[in-house]
C-alpha cells in the first residue's frame, strides 16, 4: 500500500435533504482527509466505472439508494466480484441490506419498534391510533405513510413494506460510531421538527443500548449511526441502524468533537486498508 492511499469518495453533493447539507459535510470531510489520502470525489452513478483505479471506495452522503437501485446493485456486484475495498464494507446487516433486519430484531425480542411485514402478524403489534407503513428499501422517510388499523386491511403492498405502531415518543436520539468507538450523540427535542438536532449527553445505559446494535452488526470498520426514540416509559427503542451512508451532522458538534471524529475516521481507514 502506498504511503498516501487513493480514495474514491462517493457523494451526491447536490442532493436536497430537509434541514441537512450533504455537500457541505463532504466538502469539509474531504478537505481534512486530504492530509492523509489522495482523494477524488464522484457521483454514485459514476462509482462503478471509476472504482478500479483507487485503493478503496468510501461511500458517504450518496443519497437514498431507492433513487438508483439498479445502478447500486451493479456497483455492489462488481465490487464484490472484483474484490474492491468499499468503506463501509458491504457486509453490513443494517440499512445497507434493507430494513428487513427490523423484523429479525423484533423476532429476537431486542429493544426495537415492533415491526411486521405480513397481514397475519398485525395482531402481534401493540394497539395504536395509527401505524407507520414504510418501504423495505426506503430512506429519508421516502414513501412513509401513516394508516389506521382499518386502512391496513386494504393495504395491497404487503411484501414490499414494513408496518410499525406509531409511537408517541418523547424525542429521537442518534449515536454516532467509527468502528466500535462512540464519537458523539445528537437528539431532536421536538418530535414535530425531527430534523432540528442538538448535542446530547448520553448516560451509561444509553451507550450500552447503542453499542449493543453496533456489536450485533459485526462491522470491523466503518461509520454507523444508531437512531432511537425515547418511548413514553423512558426506554429507548431502535428506529434504524444506518450503516450504508449515514449523514453525520458534523456542523452541529463542537470543533474538538468534529476534529476527533475526523482523526478517528482517518485512523479507521488506515487500518481498513492495512
Q: What are these regions, as identified by a protein language model?
A:
Residues 1-85:
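ATP-binding N-terminal substructure of ATP-dependent carboxylate-amine bond-forming enzymes
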Residues 12, 62, 120, 136, ...:
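Flexible loop residues that form catalytic
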Residues 35, 108-111, 216-222:
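Short secondary-structure junctions
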Residues 46-53, 77, 122-127, 152-155:
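Short amphipathic alpha-helix with an adjacent loop that forms part of the alpha/beta core around
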Residues 54-59, 134, 175-177, 184, ...:
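A short beta-strand motif that forms the metal-chelation/ATP-contact edge
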Residues 230-274:
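C-terminal active-site "lid" helix and adjoining low-complexity regulatory extension at the edge
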Amino acid at each position: 500500500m502506498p504511503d498516501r492511499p487513493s480514495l474514491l469518495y462517493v457523494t451526491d453533493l447536490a442532493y436536497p435533504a430537509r434541514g441537512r447539507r450533504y455537500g457541505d459535510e463532504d466538502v469539509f470531510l474531504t478537505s481534512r482527509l486530504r492530509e492523509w489520502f489522495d482523494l477524488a470525489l464522484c457521483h454514485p452513478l459514476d462509482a462503478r466505472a471509476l472504482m478500479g483505479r483507487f485503493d478503496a471506495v468510501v461511500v458517504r452522503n450518496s443519497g437514498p439508494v431507492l433513487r438508483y437501485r439498479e445502478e447500486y446493485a451493479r456497483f455492489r456486484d462488481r465490487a464484490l466480484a472484483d474484490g474492491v475495498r468499499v468503506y463501509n464494507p458491504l457486509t453490513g446487516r443494517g440499512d445497507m441490506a434493507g430494513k428487513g433486519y427490523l423484523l429479525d430484531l423484533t423476532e429476537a425480542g431486542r429493544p426495537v419498534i415492533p415491526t411486521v411485514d405480513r397481514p397475519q402478524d398485525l395482531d402481534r403489534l401493540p394497539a395504536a391510533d395509527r401505524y407507520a407503513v414504510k418501504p423495505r428499501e426506503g430512506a429519508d422517510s421516502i414513501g412513509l405513510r401513516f394508516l389506521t388499523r382499518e386502512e391496513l386491511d386494504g393495504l395491497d403492498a404487503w411484501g414490499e413494506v414494513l408496518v410499525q405502531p406509531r409511537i408517541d415518543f418523547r424525542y429521537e436520539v442518534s449515536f454516532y460510531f467509527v468502528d466500535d468507538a462512540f464519537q458523539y450523540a445528537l437528539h431532536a427535542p421536538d418530535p414535530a421538527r425531527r430534523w432540528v438536532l442538538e448535542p446530547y449527553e448520553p448516560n451509561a445505559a444509553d451507550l450500552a443500548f447503542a453499542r449493543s446494535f453496533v456489536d450485533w452488526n459485526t462491522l470491523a470498520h466503518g461509520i454507523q449511526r444508531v437512531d432511537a426514540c425515547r418511548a413514553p416509559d423512558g426506554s429507548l427503542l431502535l428506529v434504524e441502524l444506518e450503516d450504508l451512508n449515514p449523514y453525520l451532522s458534523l456542523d452541529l458538534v463542537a470543533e474538538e468533537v468534529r476534529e476527533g471524529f475526523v482523526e478517528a475516521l482517518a485512523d479507521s481507514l488506515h487500518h481498513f486498508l492495512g
